Amino acid sequence: CGSNQSSSTSTKKLKAGNFDVAYQNPDKAIKGGNLKVAYQSDSPMKAQWLSGLSNDATFATMSGPGGGQDGLFFTDSGFKFIKGGAADVALDKESKTATITLRKDLKWSDGSEVTAKDYEFTYETIANPAYGSDRWTDSLANIVGLSDYHAGKAKTISGITFPDGENGKVIKVQFKEMKPGMTQSGNGYFLETVAPYQYLKDVAPKDLASSPKTTTKPLVTGPFKPENVVAGESIKYVPNPYYWGKKPKLNSITYEVVSTAKSVAALSSSKYDFINGMVSSQYKQVKNLKGYKVLGQQAMAISLMYYNLGHYDAKNSINVQDRKTPLQDQNVRQAIGYARNVAEVANKFSNGLSTPANSLIPPIFKQFTSSSVKGYEKQDLDKANKLLDEDGWKLNKSTGYREKDGKELSLVYAAHVGDANAETIAQNYIQQWKKIGVKVSLYNGKLMEFNSWVDHMTTPPGANDWDITDGSWSLASEPSQQDLFSASAPYNFGHFNDSEITKDLNDIDSAKSENPTYRKAAFVKYQEDMNKKAYVVPTNFSLSYTPVNKRVVGMTLDYGAMDTWSEIGVSSAKLATK
Amino acid sequence: MWKVIIRRILLMIPQLFILSILVFFFAKLMPGDPFSGLIGPHTDPHEVEALRRAAGLYDPWWEQYLRWLGNAIHGNLGMSYNLKEPVMTVIGHRAINTFWMSLLSVILTYLFAIPMSIVAARNEGKWQDQLWLTYNSITFGIPPYVFYLLIIFIFGYSLNWFPTGGTVSPDAMGIIPVFFSKIYHMILPAFSLAVFGTVGIFTYFRSGILDEQTQDYVRTARAKGVKEKVIFRRHILRNASLPIASNFGFVITGLLGGAIFAETIFGYPGLGQLFITSISGRDYSMITALILLNGFLGLLGALLSDIIMAMVDPRIRIQ
């Protein structure tokens, strides 16, 4: 999703863990001012202002002041579409359509009108293979005629029409079927951005991605426009005179890339007003910096533990749960989950930036989850032992490990390289599992190199030489987990296939779930079933943080803040040092 | 001599050919591929599969190699998987950055190292010699990136004298401001490379001077009553610079080699940084092109060095 950001008074008291989500600066903003911000990354940013051709996370953030690659819709903090943005969307169940109405005064930064064709053009850049985009997904095939266009069988997209012409402001998108997730931003069923068709129509498709018109001299719709784009390094923004919304307070914003090795030093010498994308291991150095206030927000991410239960049948696109392993017993899976001391680990290593996860849906999606769902947050060795006893696993006093039918309960843990503490944490879990008599050893006796691990987990049909692994995902703002755990999901590393879970997942995306109360209940049932069956075990939710200089006024990390770049200002010409 | 040079250039073709096979083969052995990074719940695995198939990554490596070779002969080194631009375009942009920064650093290195070596050699065993020997031992012994960080911290962050990253300020618009901003941005990395990169020249040049000082022709000159200054300038320095000259070809081609550590730490987008990001992103086409470029530069450097030697030392002839 690529929406602008903003603050409303009701969200200012928001907390994430111990962090404030918004900075309530007692000082007033001066007129004008130049904001200096940075994104932490060790590779150069790849400027690409068309969302359909862009795949660089660094740039996706850095394009924010220009409108975030020309996002159209406003959302609330739970990512549900609301009215008032550059365009509004209206869904109609009967006719199975979405009607997108662009604002009358919505203009590109050269003063030309944003038209209905500009909305349709983004679909072309994604669906027409000539543009070389990697953003095509099967969810888009739900739009009538789009897969035919994608496959080259049709010259136009029959399901996208313009009731008042190409140069009008209304677009009708015809779906094959409606989905309850369509009310959420990031749902993937329809796109949320525009691209300047008139400006780009003469560029050959294969040259579009490298054309100056999409890289250094773009048109945008946001509160600021890029005045200077230095390839790989930085963007200087100035206010966009044609912006339809709230006029920005600042005179300019410079947005740079800063390397990991330098970001803390840059903050301590007050080089930047804030830095995005800092990692948790840097938090200790950042939390007491003079002149800065650290804001935090729930990350849209989940980490979890997988059990290897089967293989992926690539030919039929289905997970087959057929592996011979003690992990097929629910009791064993639960026991291994209960034996982990995730709370202690989070406490010791995360600097307060991780909390044990009670389910697979992070609390930021409060309309879809409930704190009443109980998972494996607390270590419970007694319960784990009891579960294994019940299941007939007897402790062999001489080895210290459990056995059943003469076979030892011995498992392979495919832990992979991560941050500096990864090995310590993996060894810690192995010790915890030993306490309940489960023998666990690392895959090949060491942590796996990350790329090898990805290959090992994602190459069908999947390997038979591991039992436990850890994974983490960043989540889309539409939290349905079909892509992660459905029977056909290739990223379901453990390859479980359970009719009840499939039913739960389908229920979340069913027509009934168009009723929000019903959908929430369906989500909660799904989370409870997943915890009970323990095919995967949730590990942590995490917080992201952003250090903000004390001269900055109006800064917030609230996902529902839609005018942040217009609202943001500074209280003095120089950065605060105290 | 021209015959020899042409023969040497022709010989480069099979050498580069073998190098390209090795690079191609080993690059494919790395786990992961350019599309591994796309894997996520937001991307459709079938689409990733289709991209891999379209890029020909499932063909046997020799088939991929032959396809690549066919294009390369026509001057097309392919598209970068990750940057979605022609490899040559990307390398071209980065090469300009790397070239100017390297040039500045080479000039500065000689400016530091040569006087340093002369002072040390002329005062053999005295405190001046000890000082510069110790200095060079330290800068040689400690990994240079430690110094780079220190330099950034002192001159960039504490004193605020120089920019700490990038090649040009986003505020600079127009030809002249951009030019000066670029120079300003390369001073700190070039200076750091130079100050901590003197050891090679220092060692060769200092011992060269010391060796030449005891030669017969020096004694003869002294006996003839030639002034010490003249002996040093005309005879000793000239002969002592031969070992440095023998390396000069590599210095010239090295201008495009890219400084991996310095570029990464200073956030200076040159070829060195491009190489690292290409490897971690499994950007095969870029990796292959960069290694070939470096291989070619190495061979060319050796040839240039030989030519330079033949020019400065009348005893040597290329045959």
Curated annotation (Swiss-Prot), chain B:
It comes from the Bacteria. Pfam families: BPD_transp_1 (PF00528), BPD_transp_1_N (PF19300). SUPFAM superfamilies: MetI-like. Its main location: membrane. It is a multi-pass membrane protein. Keywords: Cell membrane, Membrane, Peptide transport, Protein transport, Transmembrane, Transmembrane helix, Transport. GO terms for biological process: peptide transport; protein transport; transmembrane transport. Part of the ABC transporter complex OppABCDF involved in the uptake of oligopeptides. Probably responsible for the translocation of the substrate across the membrane. Essential for uptake of peptides larger than three amino acids and for growth in milk. It is found in: Cell membrane. InterPro entries: BPD_transp_1_N, MetI-like, MetI-like_sf. The chain crosses the membrane at residues 9-29, 99-119, 137-157, 183-203, 248-268, 289-309. The gene is oppB. PROSITE patterns: ABC_TM1 (PS50928). Residues 95-305 form the ABC transmembrane type-1 domain. Belongs to the binding-protein-dependent transport system permease family. OppBC subfamily. This is Oligopeptide transport system permease protein OppB. One of its GO terms (cellular component) is plasma membrane. The complex is composed of two ATP-binding proteins (OppD and OppF), two transmembrane proteins (OppB and OppC) and a solute-binding protein (OppA). Gene3D superfamilies: MetI-like.
